[in-house]
Design a protein with these regions (language model features):
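Glycine-rich beta-strand-turn "strand-cap" elements at beta-sheet edges
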Residues: 1-24, 61-71, 96-122
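Intrinsic-disorder/low-complexity regions
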Residues: 7-9, 27, 35, 46, ...
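Short, well-ordered beta-strand segments in beta-rich or mixed alpha/beta enzyme
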Residues: 23-31, 61-90
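Short amphipathic alpha-helical segments
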Residues: 34-59, 92-100
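A broadly tuned preference for mixed-charge, low-complexity surface segments
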Residues: 78-91, 95, 114-122
Length: 122
């Protein structure tokens, strides 16, 4: 199971799951040992396949940092916090977490789009 390290110590993912919003974006930063990279990619693919079949899932994309160290960023869009919460707390998904390499550290955080005048829309 990956160690969970919050991006925001004062407002970790467990607290964010209690806020109703939508759509939401999950940003999950992963770090791990280089030798665990193949195992990480295999289990992430299985997890993403599971999430893709859940109600409220819109899309996901995995990114790898440039350079030698395996640092990954997962960006997933969900219709709502409640849809993500239901998928994340699903016992079948929770059981899969044990398969992650011991070196894996995950930093999940939920975001919502905002509008900035003349730049982007929410």
């Amino acid at each position: 199971m990956p160690l969970l390290r919050p991006l925001d110590l004062d407002f970790p993912i467990a607290r964010q799951l209690g806020i109703e919003a939508g759509p939401v974006v999950l940003v999950n930063l992963f770090t791990l040992a280089k030798e665990d990279e193949p195992a990480f990619l295999k289990i992430w693919q299985e997890d993403a396949g599971f999430m893709k079949r859940q109600p409220g899932f819109i899309s996901t994309q995995l990114h790898r940092a440039l350079g030698e160290n395996p640092t990954y960023l997962n960006y997933a869009v969900w219709e709502s916090t409640s849809a993500f919460r239901a998928a994340f707390s699903n016992p079948a998904f929770q059981a899969k977490l044990a398969a992650y390499p011991a070196s894996a550290v995950a930093s999940p955080h939920l975001f919502e789009k905002i509008a900035v005048a003349n730049i982007c829309v929410a």
